[in-house]
Structures are given as C-alpha cells and as structure tokens.
C-alpha cells in the first residue's frame, strides 16, 4: 500500500513539473514570434529591464516566496523519499515474488489446466508425491513394459538440494525416467524466466521449517531449520511399523527403504535398482546412485563420522568426499530432513551391506 502511494505521489509531482515546463516553453516561444521589428527593440538583451522599485518590490517578494515554497518541498520531499523508499522496494520485491509464484503455479499445473503437468506426476499442486506412467525398456531383451514410476514429493526438495542443483535437474531432467529435460539448454521447452518462476512456486510449497536461525525470516527455505518434529516423529512411526510388521529387520533398513513421499525421504529410490517402479532388485546394489553393497561404503568412508557428515550435507559439485570421491551435486543432503538418530541408523545398516 505504501509503495503504491509513493509511486502515485511521484507520478503526480512529475506531471506537475512537466506541465509547468511545457506551459513556460509554449508561452515563451509564442511571445518571441509575436512581432517583427528592429533588433534594438526586440533583442532580449537590449530591452529595458524592470526598474529598482519594481525589482525590489512585489516581484522580489514573489520570487523569494516561490523559492521558499520550493525549499520547503525539497526539505519535506527528500526525507519522505528516504523514509518511504525502503518500503517501496520491499513492496515491489514482494509483488514480484507473488507474481512469479502465480506464473510458476500455472506452469506446475496439469496439462488439462494449461501447465506442463508437474502436478500430474508429483502428487497435486502441493507435490506430496505421486506416480507417473512410463514405458520401461529392458536393455537385455529389448522388451518394453508399462510401469508406474514413483515421482517423489517436491515439498521438501529445497531441504535436500540448493537452488542451483534444483535448476540443473529441471534443465536436464532425469533422462532414464519419466522426468524429461525442461530447460532450453537441455532440449526442453522452458526459458530461463519460466524456470525462475517455476522454482519460485516450488519454494512456496515447501513444508515450513522449525528452529530457523536468527535473521532467517523465511521458514520455507531457512538454511538452519529442519523438518518439523511432528513429521520426523511420523517417519519414526512408519519405520517402527515396518519393523513390527516383519517387513524389515531393523529401523535402519526400514528408513533406507521408506516409501513415504514416494521415496523422497529414502535411499533405496536411487541406490536400489527397480525400486522406483515397484520391482526392486538387490537392496543398495546401485542404480542412479552408486553400489553400496560388498562393504564399498566402508572403503569410501573409513571413518563412520565422515559418512554421517556426507549423508547430512550431500555432495557439492567438484568437491572431494570420502577417500577418493568427487561430488557431482546429485547426492542430496538429508541433514534437515532426518534426525541425527535416523541418519545414524541408516549408516549402520548401509555399512553392513
């Protein structure tokens, strides 16, 4: 509201000043061509000027009065501008974010509603996880079968990935899956601004975080926050239920294979072949993520604490991890999603494979 008022006042002042100058120019030009005569009579620098009585009388008073009025305007207007400009900028920024979120929502919509069908695969406009039909090619036999590929929840994607990593995934997709490239650079249909608005919408649907640090005003993306305790307790309950039902032997195994959010919280989604379409092979044998079996994690991470830190933080492009690993940004960080105990239990299970 303040931003709109400030803008209106600025336009009003601009209009008044412009009108004044235009009027002055018009009258001056019109007066200059009224009559023809000798240079002595018409040249501006040869005309008789006002006498002292007139100059030091009403005319001087009028000019000084105008000067005082202009000075008052400057004295008031500049401080007001200084006070109101931050609010105007904040309002403009918020308006831009709201506009981008609205545009991004249109892109996220189903195809039937004019979007690119992100919501159709990922579980609605809140992206809680869903499924996508996919023709799966068997590289050995050449046969094709129709499967339902688990499309992960996206309402926690910024818990695990940075904005740059999310943008990369959107641009290039996951070409072995139903997720196609969406950015022009990757061969998709979206330009940079469309990707920016799509990311803005995805940020707006993140689960609000708890325990954000001082000065971190946005609970949707605050760096030091974590998944609400209620949701973390729900993950514990699901793991306990799976163990009690005999589906898994340990909580670590249950957490590794957690199906909640279409695998958005699990490890098996990337590290177990076939898990994403409901036909899992050997647990942890490797798919999009590398093979975790045969003690390979113990070779990569001689120190268990290093492996815990890696799972919490994920990999960063070009940075070293473990013994001889170099990050690509593909490994997400789970430190803001899972509790310390949950990560510890997963590590103990994985190191036993």
Show the residue positions of the predicted features.
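Electrostatic cytochrome c docking/interface patches
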Residues: 84-113, 129, 219-263
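Extracytoplasmic electron-transfer domains, predominantly the class I c-type cytochrome c fold
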Residues: 135-205, 278-353
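Short pre-active-site segment immediately N-terminal to redox-active cysteine/selenocysteine motifs
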Residues: 111-120, 125, 150, 178, ...
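Short sequence/structural segments immediately N-terminal
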Residues: 56-65, 69, 89-95, 101, ...
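Sequence context surrounding c-type heme c attachment/ligation sites in exported
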Residues: 102-119, 253-268, 278-285, 302, ...
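Membrane-proximal soluble helical/coiled-coil segments
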Residues: 84-175
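Surface-exposed intrinsically disordered loops and tails
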Residues: 125-146, 212-245, 257-258, 274-288, ...
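N-terminal export/targeting leaders of redox proteins
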Residues: 1-98, 207, 214, 218-226
């Amino acid at each position: 509201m303040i931003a709109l008022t400030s803008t209106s006042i600025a336009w009003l002042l601009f209009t008044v000043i412009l009108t004044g100058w235009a009027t002055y120019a018009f009258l001056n030009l019109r007066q200059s061509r009224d009559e023809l005569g000798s240079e002595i009579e018409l040249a501006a620098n040869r005309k008789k000027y006002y006498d002292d009585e007139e100059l030091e009388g009403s005319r001087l008073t009028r000019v000084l009065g105008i000067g005082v009025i202009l000075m008052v305007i400057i004295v008031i207007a500049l401080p007001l501008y200084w006070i109101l400009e931050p609010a105007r900028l904040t309002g403009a920024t918020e308006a831009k974010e709201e506009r981008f979120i609205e545009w991004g929502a249109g892109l996220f919509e189903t195809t039937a509603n004019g979007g690119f069908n992100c919501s159709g695969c990922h579980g609605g406009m809140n992206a809680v996880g869903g499924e996508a039909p996919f023709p799966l090619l068997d590289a050995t036999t050449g046969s094709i079968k129709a499967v339902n590929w688990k499309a992960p929840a996206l309402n926690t994607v910024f818990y695990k990935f940075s904005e740059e990593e999310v943008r990369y995934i959107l641009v290039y997709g996951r070409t072995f899956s139903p997720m196609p490239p969406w950015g022009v650079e990757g061969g998709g249909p979206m330009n940079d601004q469309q990707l920016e608005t799509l990311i803005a919408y995805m940020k707006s649907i993140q689960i609000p975080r708890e325990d954000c640090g001082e000065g971190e005003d946005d609970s949707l993306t605050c760096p030091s926050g974590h998944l609400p305790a209620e949701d973390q307790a729900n993950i514990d309950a699901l793991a306990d239920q799976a163990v009690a039902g005999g589906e898994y032997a340990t909580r670590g195994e249950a957490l590794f294979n957690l199906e909640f959010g279409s695998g958005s919280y699990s490890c098996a989604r990337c590290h177990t072949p076939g898990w994403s379409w409901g036909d899992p092979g050997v647990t942890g044998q490797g798919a999009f993520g590398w093979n975790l079996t045969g003690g390979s994690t113990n070779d990569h991470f001689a120190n268990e604490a290093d492996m815990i830190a890696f799972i919490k933080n994920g990999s960063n492009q070009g940075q070293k991890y473990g013994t001889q690993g170099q990050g690509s940004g593909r490994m997400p960080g789970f430190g803001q999603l899972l509790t310390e105990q949950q990560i510890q239990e997963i590590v103990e299970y994985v190191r036993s494979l």
